[in-house]
């Protein structure tokens, strides 16, 4: 009986992967592989479509067909399985100022993001400040950028990884 269970599980796993969008599967596999390597002071950026392509040896850019809020949920779920790192989420403070008239969909986006933040360490900082932190970190640490199909101003989500066994407070 147990000889049948493992092959059945493998077949189901592989058939589930075949149904997934290749771009989705690629960034998720890369993130999963990188989570074993990365630690405190590494970053994950969930970026809107116009986010610049950073250069450098520690920068890896992936593309997702999902929206930023959908990718955030996927990333947070993966991070919850990891004991060695915890997310410190940073969002641009300018996001609060954008109106629905200027950027249709922004209200829904903010609401979706705000539902995921309670119980997690998160901050609002000016976009320029967060970008400086990313540029500094990229000189010494790994930064994984996941570009999404979101096209809303100031909608980038920045996650600095912190030690999972050390309370930063």
Segment roles from a protein language model:
Residues 37-40, 82-84, 137-140:
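Flexible, charged surface loops at secondary-structure boundaries
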Residues 1-7, 12:
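Sec-dependent signal peptide recognition
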Residues 42-45, 60-61, 86-90, 121-124, ...:
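Structural motif
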Residues 14-16:
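C-terminal motif of bacterial Sec signal peptides marking the signal peptidase cleavage site
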Residues 52-54, 61-87, 107-124:
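Feature captures the catalytic cores and cofactor-binding loops of soluble hydro-lyases/lyases
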């Amino acid at each position: 009986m147990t000889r049948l269970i493992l092959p059945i599980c493998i077949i189901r796993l592989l058939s589930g992967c075949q149904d997934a969008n290749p771009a989705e599967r690629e960034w998720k596999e890369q993130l999963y592989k990188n989570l074993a390597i990365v630690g405190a002071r590494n970053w994950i950026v969930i970026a809107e479509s116009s986010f610049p392509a950073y250069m450098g040896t520690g920068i890896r850019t992936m593309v997702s067909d999902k929206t930023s809020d959908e990718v955030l949920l996927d990333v947070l779920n993966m991070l919850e399985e990891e004991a060695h790192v915890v997310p410190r989420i940073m969002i641009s403070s300018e996001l609060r100022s954008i109106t629905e008239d200027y950027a249709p969909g922004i209200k829904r986006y903010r609401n979706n993001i705000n539902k995921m933040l309670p119980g997690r360490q998160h901050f609002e900082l000016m976009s320029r400040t967060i970008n400086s932190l990313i540029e500094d970190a990229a000189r010494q640490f790994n930064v994984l950028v996941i570009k999404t199909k979101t096209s809303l101003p100031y909608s980038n989500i920045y996650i600095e990884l912190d030690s999972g066994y050390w309370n930063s407070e």
